[in-house]
């Protein structure tokens, strides 16, 4: 009899795992007989929330994203097919919003980046030569709500104009009556007559022109007296640029007399600060070449450190030349013998060779005589006489 209060489970213990397995099989079958999430696109987005799976024949719809607009008749929907894939669809039906067309500015150009006016791209502006840009050089196509507009107003190209060039002391320029100069308009400067004996020199470029950004091409020149001293080179002479006076950019050339060499440049120019550039050269005396022949050495001269050389009969400082200690290359010195010119190890080799040769000459005959004695003589037991015989 079963104990009271205990009820029997209506399902045997083996049935619960079986039911769970059956449910998983049914769920797997339902998944395998469906489509996964629909594809995503750059220009379109799914209407509604996506599901983990879709049944066969189920349809999903798309709409154009912000910044894009729909152009029919291309489809913007797809259907889950029997082979568990989505029918082909693309976002070609959605086009980017474009900004309004911009004309080329007068005397300039508007260049769209990548050749398009679509939002997210840029428009670059450039002006023709002789004109400069007023405004933003780059505009951006942006979205304001659902409309694409440019980030600013298009710039304009203005003609390059320059104010009159500066006036200079002791000089003037052409077109001094003109108040406004256009691009590449040029003026030329010149110096006034000098009140003294030396004229004014024009330092700098005589002609300048109105350039980019309404700025003159160079700084204005100046007029002043430039006079260099007469160049004098001792032990030399002037070979070109002769004159009594040397003004701005005067050029002179020099050469030295025989027995002298030039220290410096042979050509000098009178600079704007009334000095020669480079400095006036010098002509220095050519020193005689030093003798390279070593003095003759006597065999009677001792090499001891205590031996003193004989005093020179000439007064003044003694020469610092030291005779070389090496032998003449190839042959011994005339005053040396053959043995003096040989190295110690060479002499040692010769001595050893002589000793070995003498030893060989002495030992060979001795050994020969010893062998002859052993073969040709013997002593008898009776008379102990020496008997000689000759073998046949």
From Swiss-Prot:
<keyword id="KW-0968">Cytoplasmic vesicle</keyword>
<keyword id="KW-1015">Disulfide bond</keyword>
<dbReference type="GO" id="GO:0009986">
    <property type="term" value="C:cell surface"/>
</dbReference>
<dbReference type="GO" id="GO:0035581">
    <property type="term" value="P:sequestering of extracellular ligand from receptor"/>
</dbReference>
<feature type="disulfide bond">
    <location>
        <begin position="35"/>
        <end position="80"/>
    </location>
</feature>
<dbReference type="GO" id="GO:0006958">
    <property type="term" value="P:complement activation, classical pathway"/>
</dbReference>
<feature type="glycosylation site" description="O-linked (GalNAc...) serine">
    <location>
        <position position="305"/>
    </location>
</feature>
<feature type="glycosylation site" description="O-linked (GalNAc...) threonine">
    <location>
        <position position="163"/>
    </location>
</feature>
<comment type="subunit">
    <text>Interacts with C3b. Interacts with C4b. Interacts with moesin/MSN.</text>
</comment>
<feature type="compositionally biased region" description="Low complexity">
    <location>
        <begin position="291"/>
        <end position="315"/>
    </location>
</feature>
<feature type="disulfide bond">
    <location>
        <begin position="99"/>
        <end position="141"/>
    </location>
</feature>
<protein>
    <recommendedName>
        <fullName>Membrane cofactor protein</fullName>
    </recommendedName>
</protein>
<feature type="glycosylation site" description="O-linked (GalNAc...) threonine">
    <location>
        <position position="320"/>
    </location>
</feature>
<dbReference type="GO" id="GO:0071636">
    <property type="term" value="P:positive regulation of transforming growth factor beta production"/>
</dbReference>
<feature type="glycosylation site" description="O-linked (GalNAc...) serine">
    <location>
        <position position="315"/>
    </location>
</feature>
<feature type="glycosylation site" description="O-linked (GalNAc...) serine">
    <location>
        <position position="304"/>
    </location>
</feature>
<feature type="signal peptide">
    <location>
        <begin position="1"/>
        <end position="34"/>
    </location>
</feature>
<keyword id="KW-0391">Immunity</keyword>
<dbReference type="InterPro" id="IPR000436">
    <property type="entry name" value="Sushi_SCR_CCP_dom"/>
</dbReference>
<keyword id="KW-0812">Transmembrane</keyword>
<dbReference type="GO" id="GO:0042102">
    <property type="term" value="P:positive regulation of T cell proliferation"/>
</dbReference>
<keyword id="KW-0675">Receptor</keyword>
<feature type="glycosylation site" description="O-linked (GalNAc...) serine">
    <location>
        <position position="326"/>
    </location>
</feature>
<dbReference type="GO" id="GO:0005615">
    <property type="term" value="C:extracellular space"/>
</dbReference>
<keyword id="KW-0399">Innate immunity</keyword>
<dbReference type="GO" id="GO:0002250">
    <property type="term" value="P:adaptive immune response"/>
</dbReference>
<feature type="glycosylation site" description="O-linked (GalNAc...) serine">
    <location>
        <position position="298"/>
    </location>
</feature>
<comment type="function">
    <text>(Microbial infection) A number of viral and bacterial pathogens seem to bind MCP in order to exploit its immune regulation property and directly induce an immunosuppressive phenotype in T-cells.</text>
</comment>
<dbReference type="GO" id="GO:0032733">
    <property type="term" value="P:positive regulation of interleukin-10 production"/>
</dbReference>
<comment type="function">
    <text>Acts as a cofactor for complement factor I, a serine protease which protects autologous cells against complement-mediated injury by cleaving C3b and C4b deposited on host tissue. May be involved in the fusion of the spermatozoa with the oocyte during fertilization. Also acts as a costimulatory factor for T-cells which induces the differentiation of CD4+ into T-regulatory 1 cells. T-regulatory 1 cells suppress immune responses by secreting interleukin-10, and therefore are thought to prevent autoimmunity.</text>
</comment>
<dbReference type="InterPro" id="IPR017341">
    <property type="entry name" value="CD46"/>
</dbReference>
<feature type="domain" description="Sushi 2">
    <location>
        <begin position="97"/>
        <end position="159"/>
    </location>
</feature>
<feature type="glycosylation site" description="O-linked (GalNAc...) serine">
    <location>
        <position position="302"/>
    </location>
</feature>
<dbReference type="GO" id="GO:0070062">
    <property type="term" value="C:extracellular exosome"/>
</dbReference>
<dbReference type="GO" id="GO:0001618">
    <property type="term" value="F:virus receptor activity"/>
</dbReference>
<dbReference type="GO" id="GO:0045591">
    <property type="term" value="P:positive regulation of regulatory T cell differentiation"/>
</dbReference>
<feature type="glycosylation site" description="O-linked (GalNAc...) serine">
    <location>
        <position position="290"/>
    </location>
</feature>
<feature type="glycosylation site" description="O-linked (GalNAc...) serine">
    <location>
        <position position="312"/>
    </location>
</feature>
<feature type="topological domain" description="Cytoplasmic">
    <location>
        <begin position="367"/>
        <end position="392"/>
    </location>
</feature>
<feature type="glycosylation site" description="N-linked (GlcNAc...) asparagine">
    <location>
        <position position="83"/>
    </location>
</feature>
<keyword id="KW-0180">Complement pathway</keyword>
<dbReference type="InterPro" id="IPR035976">
    <property type="entry name" value="Sushi/SCR/CCP_sf"/>
</dbReference>
């Amino acid at each position: 009899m079963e104990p009271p209060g205990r009820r029997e489970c209506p399902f045997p213990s083996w049935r619960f795992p079986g039911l769970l397995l059956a449910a998983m099989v049914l769920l797997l079958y339902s998944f395998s007989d469906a489509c996964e999430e629909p594809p995503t696109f750059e220009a379109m987005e799914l209407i509604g929330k996506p599901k983990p799976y879709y049944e066969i024949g189920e349809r999903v719809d798309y709409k154009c994203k912000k910044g894009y607009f729909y152009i029919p008749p291309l489809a913007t929907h797809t259907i889950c097919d029997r082979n568990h894939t989505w029918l082909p669809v693309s976002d070609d039906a959605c086009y980017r919003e474009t900004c309004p067309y911009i004309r080329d500015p007068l005397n300039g150009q508007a260049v769209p980046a990548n050749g398009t006016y679509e939002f997210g791209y840029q428009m670059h502006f450039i002006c023709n030569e002789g004109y400069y840009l007023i405004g933003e050089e780059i505009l951006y196509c942006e979205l304001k709500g659902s409309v694409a507009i440019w980030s600013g107003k298009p710039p304009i190209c203005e003609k390059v104009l320059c104010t009159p060039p500066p006036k200079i002391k002791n000089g003037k320029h052409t077109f001094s009556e003109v108040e406004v100069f256009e691009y590449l308009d040029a003026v030329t400067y010149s110096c006034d007559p000098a009140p003294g004996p030396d004229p004014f020199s024009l330092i700098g470029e005589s002609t300048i022109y109105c350039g980019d950004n309404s700025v003159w091409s160079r700084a204005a020149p100046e007029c002043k007296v430039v006079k260099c001293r007469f160049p004098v080179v001792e032990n030399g002479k002037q070979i070109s640029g002769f004159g009594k006076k040397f003004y701005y950019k005067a050029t002179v050339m020099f050469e030295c007399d025989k027995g002298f060499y030039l220290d410096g440049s042979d050509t000098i120019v009178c600079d704007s600060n009334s000095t020669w550039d480079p400095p006036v050269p010098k002509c220095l005396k050519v020193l005689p070449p030093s003798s390279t022949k070593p003095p003759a050495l006597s065999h009677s001269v001792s090499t001891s450190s205590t031996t003193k050389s004989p005093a020179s009969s000439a007064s003044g400082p003694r020469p610092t030349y030291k005779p070389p200690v090496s032998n003449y290359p190839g042959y011994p010195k005339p005053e040396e013998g053959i043995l003096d010119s040989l190295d110690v190890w060479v002499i040692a080799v010769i001595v050893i060779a002589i000793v070995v040769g003498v030893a060989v000459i002495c030992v060979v005959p001795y050994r020969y005589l010893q062998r002859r004695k052993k073969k040709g003589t013997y002593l008898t037991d009776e008379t102990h006489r020496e008997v000689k015989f000759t073998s046949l």
